[in-house]
């Protein structure tokens, strides 16, 4: 399987997995044009689309792609049923695509119906987990997002985190504002800064590394607890997550 990223809009990535025969899976096609261009350039045959949630920058290209390739099966959560989804999937179910079994993981927070798809090593996590950050809480609660991230953080170490936006640099600036002396965060920030200066993608990232540099996955880390305790005493990791998310919203 080959993993490909297609830039869209200002900072979106549309992910495409293809096999040696050229069959492909498209994830969150917010815009059809760059996908159609990539399909033509690579002679791919689209078999399926995965949708993680209902926001337009993730579903906007579905209609045109299905018109062009009517055999495509469109998988998505209930909230995408009016966005072109033909096969509604929910937590604990599986989608069989390109000969691989993808587990569906419910991850409410960014939206109430947000889902992720996992087939080792690929995690298509939409706007739930970003490198160095997590999605804004447009519909769900901090508690829901905390639990969703916990689900993802226990996936295998070598999981490739394929999120939908190039937010890594701004996320790492925030991480440095919280833990300015953390060696892992500083090293990763420098690496990301160099990549973005060359207009290069920072994704996918390896989950094992993400656990070290993403403050939203470190709510039980003593260094982070000490920082938060300087401002307020919060006993539960869930409360610390909410504190971080609120800080990031104002950053």
Swiss-Prot record:
GO terms for molecular function: hydroxyacylglutathione hydrolase activity; metal ion binding. Its EC number is 3.1.2.6. One of its GO terms (biological process) is methylglyoxal catabolic process to D-lactate via S-lactoyl-glutathione. It holds the Pfam family Lactamase_B. Transmembrane segments: none annotated. It comes from Escherichia coli (strain ATCC 8739 / DSM 1576 / NBRC 3972 / NCIMB 8545 / WDCM 00012 / Crooks). Signal peptide: none annotated. The gene is gloB. Gene3D superfamilies: Ribonuclease Z/Hydroxyacylglutathione hydrolase-like. It comes from the Bacteria. Pathway: Secondary metabolite metabolism; methylglyoxal degradation; (R)-lactate from methylglyoxal: step 2/2. This is Hydroxyacylglutathione hydrolase.
